[in-house]
Amino acid sequence: MKLLILTCLVAVALARPKYPLRYPEVFQNEPDSIEEVLNKRKILELAVVSPIQFRQENIDELKDTRNEPTEDHIMEDTERKESGSSSSEEVVSSTTEQKDILKEDMPSQRYLEELHRLNKYKLLQLEAIRDQKLIPRVKLSSHPYLEQLYRINEDNHPQLGEPVKVVTQEQAYFHLEPFPQFFQLGASPYVAWYYPPQVMQYIAHPSSYDTPEGIASEDGGKTDVMPQWW
């Protein structure tokens, strides 16, 4: 039993590691390892801190870039406002000038309109005169009523004690006295009846035999007389 216990102890002792031989190496390498650890920690801190700094820097840059266009927009807006105000002033000045020009041109336009109306009126008068001149001259021989009126006009002047006026056929066609001409002669075959004082004197007076005569009856006692028209 004792031998077995000894053999077990020896085996355990042999199986254990030899620590005393390794410790000096560890102790020699300890400072280097500490420095390396510190360096590694610094590197890790830098690696951790750098993204935050980069983020802040990027944020600042973005803010700056955003502020720059806003400033540019503000400048552009001010320039636009100034240009709009200047253009509006120009438009107002141009409109006022146009109004002044129109006010100045109004009298001239009215004068031109009046001249135009007068010219139209004169043209109408000339056309009316030309139409009167171009009216066909109808001979009195083709209108016996006109001949009769012409003769009556000539006969009435000596009776009234007025000087005889020389009247041509054309004047007799357009003007007959003593009545003014309100219509065109020759338009109707019964024109002569519109001149009763001149025409009635040539109407035959009723003769004596046209008067009614009483016819007495054979019976003398009766006094009734019956008129009879022939």
From Swiss-Prot:
Keywords: Milk protein, Phosphoprotein, Secreted, Signal. Coiled coil: none annotated. The modification Phosphoserine is found at S33, S83, S85, S86, S87, S88. One of its GO terms (cellular component) is extracellular space. It holds the Pfam family Casein. Residues 1-15 form the signal peptide. Residues 60-103, 211-230 are annotated as: Disordered. Residues 60-83 have a biased composition (Basic and acidic residues). Its main location: secreted. Mammary gland specific. Secreted in milk. It is found in: Secreted. Important role in the capacity of milk to transport calcium phosphate. Belongs to the alpha-casein family. This is Alpha-S1-casein. The gene is CSN1S1.
